[in-house]
């Protein structure tokens, strides 16, 4: 894994220098002009759209998932603050909304309008977040590029071998989420990591992840075959059978 301090050189080499504009936003100028509030002693962006996203996330999440969303957002904020390239270039509103809404595809309420019968949960979440933005008075003024960044950040947040080479916002969202499973890194100190954990304890994260992925393997197994989720189906779901549905099966079936 690349050390956090190597990001600027890597980004230059990849040609991923990002110029963040304020077009379509309710606020203009640098990120320092956004209104702020403190959560767990961390200063975060505080726009009406971010507040609405937090409420929307709470509405469509149980307590365990909501705490995971908040931790993921705050880890990302600390990563941004610790790196000059990120702090100069990351769109804080895009990052906040992406992090807060990244697990909408886990909404387990009955007949949720956010959940499709045939798409991966990451894609359901991406579409739900896009609809949320475009349904909000402030979000309707967003330029298409910002909306697409949110979609990409959510759709790719579990595919780190891709997300880590996308735009900065997409990278930070995925890396911030990953810290909830791997522990402090990417510029987030052990002390700051622990402070976030005290405000939003993750004692229930393991069970929640297992329950959410098992439910997907039971109710939408075709969206989990040949993905990182397949081991949950293989190990915990009776009758789960990916044979014949994996890419390797299709390749050998149709190619001579």
Give the positions of each predicted feature.
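Fungal secretory targeting signals
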Residues: 1-26
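Acidic/histidine metal-binding catalytic segments
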Residues: 87-92, 137-153
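His-Asp-centered metal-binding catalytic motifs of divalent-metal-dependent phosphohydrolases/nucleases
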Residues: 91-111, 125, 129, 151-160
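An active-site-proximal "capping" alpha-helix that borders the catalytic cofactor pocket
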Residues: 72-74, 119-136
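Active-site flanking loop/helix segments enriched in acidic
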Residues: 50-68, 73, 77, 105-112
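Short alpha-helical hairpin
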Residues: 34-54
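Divalent metal-dependent phosphate-bond-processing catalytic cores, especially two-metal-ion Mg2+/Mn2+ enzymes
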Residues: 24-35, 60-63, 70, 74-88, ...
